[in-house]
């Protein structure tokens, strides 16, 4: 198995563990406030799970793209194929168990009920947006290469996205549920029946097409941090090899040391967080819209968390206490797939968590922890067998 950046695996593992907890309560009626999403504007710890996942994907992208000396059609095709595969896996999760679990009309034939079921299945979803963001960010990273150009692309996309929301938004406001243009675009593209209906019965889909543009920016923020970390590791390795011949470590090695990398990641995280807060004066922090302020606010927290983990692992050498999260992070995408399949399979066994764990918030959280432990057990087996499943 090739060398991995362990701090990134641990961050992904923490994200996956928290995802399992917040997505699988014993009862949706009994959840502690920090484990709920903000209704529309605002950001709870739960609202950081998704952008952390996307940020980690971008960071890992920087390591995997280091093998491309130049952007070729083969490289672009590989990125697009992986993005499409992630999208299709997400859509397959929407379809699972691939047949209607209830009958819409008793007078209809099975074929009529099945067709109705297909006509009302949601197209988009979490993995679908991850796939779209990966494809956009990956192609831009291959094309632009240099961090300065990528940073300029992030700024351009953010300005363009906000401009689209403002120009085509309607009353009561461009950043509101009722007035945002994203809902109209998704309804036009796939039809209202194929959109999410969890926001007051509207057709607004929080994982729709337009919002995948700023999500790609979150991915590119991760790419920039990953690019910086990988470059530091590469330069340090080269200096170490040179010092083995000369007998002493060059003075410039301090620029690529783990603590210097931690400091830079921390500073970038603070700057991104501050930028997100400042932008929120005019553009609300809104996860459903993946607003520009949300991009930098969540990205800042992701950088700060990665800096903290890198400090523990790379500077202080604390590894054993966080090995379980490393195991979860090495198969992060599969953890999402496993959790989705298991949660949608309760009905096959006549099991309803709310029946046993739905009386209060404490029991509801207990079930979340049990569920997360089951996912961890599956991923631990894969980790011990050195199996990494990639899409």
Where are the predicted features?
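Alpha-helical transmembrane segments and their immediate juxtamembrane cytosolic regions
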Residues: 1-238, 243-245, 250, 255-391
